[in-house]
Amino acid sequence: MVLTYRNAFGLKKSKCIDWLKLNVSLAKRFFGKHGRWAIAIDPSYISKAGKKTPHIGRFWSGCAQSVKHGLEIMGIGLIDIDTKDCMMLRAHQSLNNKELSLRNKTMVDFYISVIKRYRKELLKLSTLIVADAYFSTSTFVNGIKKEGFSLISRFRDNACLFYVYTGPRTGKRGRPKTKDGKIDMKNLDLTRMEKMEMKDIEGTAYTLIAYSKALKCKVRLVIWQMPNGKKKLFFSTDTSLSGEEVLLYYRTRFQIEFCFRDAKGYTGLMDCQARDKWKLDFAFNASFTSLNVAKVTMKEMGMEYSMSSFKSLMTNIYLVRRIFKACGYIPNRTLISKIFKDLSCLQRIAA
């Protein structure tokens, strides 16, 4: 049976499309076979009314900056720090607070379980997970560490961090000394850190290996001092990364936000009115896959990325083909080719 959107809509997991495998192949077609990749994760609020939809509840909406009634999906994407782009891999619907309480789990525990579910395929792409400051907790770091992943994220501005002791051992009994004084963000010891040379950032950035009290481990720390005097703290639990790589990975993470924006605006991420979890799962992932196909097509056609222009182009091509099909005569191919190009490019605008 040939799968179409209609006959695949609502199929159970065992019979449905392997979205992760499909999107990985599209990502490799877009980025190439290899690159400096990381797994970006981000929960996103989906507006939904009613009471009977599976997992409906109250979730945080970043756009509204408040908790709202609806659904939430955990978006998993692949980012490339060289092309500074993102391809979506999978969407997984989140449980609501009542369902989590019955399972004696927190939302962070649930996010870890989602990564565990797809770990086999994700580890083939990267061992790095990039997420916002919400995920910079010991529970999440230890949870993904067991699955073979390291975290790149951002600390709160008041995070408790220490310089790492690098001196000789005393030879005394007991645990070796690991910390060598708290890092005072208002009075940095520049002799213990390295200044980063990055042309595309404003302000000054420094990097060092530090000890995090909250995470209870050593991290590669990047201290970004902005022109207004404020400091932002980025880190990686993989200390082999350079400070430049940590900052590049975290800044590229924001590309997943643009994927959510374009999927909501152009490929119907929020349009499904189904009340079945398999149909919702299909709709969410079909939306992201449609976005991936559009990105690959635009790249291979040599088009600048613009979902608005691409959607207009595809609509025009569809209408032109319908007109030609309905004409019922043998066309002049040279003339029709010229007319086809003229008509299909109508209403193309920049995003």
Per-range role (PLM):
Residues 1-194, 202-212, 222:
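Conserved, well-structured functional cores that handle cations and Mg-NTP chemistry
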Residues 134, 240-241:
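Short, surface-exposed acidic/glycine-rich loop or hinge patches that mediate macromolecular interfaces
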Residues 45, 243-274:
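Short amphipathic alpha-helical "interface-anchor" segments enriched in bulky aromatics
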Residues 83-91, 104-108, 112-116, 164-223, ...:
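A short, flexible helix-boundary coil/loop motif
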Residues 72, 255, 259, 285-289:
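Catalytic-loop motifs flanking and including active-site residues across diverse enzymes
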Residues 156-157, 224, 237-239, 263-266:
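Histidine- and/or cysteine-centered catalytic micro-motif in compact active-site loops
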Residues 12, 80, 238, 250-253, ...:
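Generic structural signal for hydrophobic core residues of well-folded globular domains
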Residues 212-240:
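Charge-patterned, long linear interaction tracts outside catalytic cores
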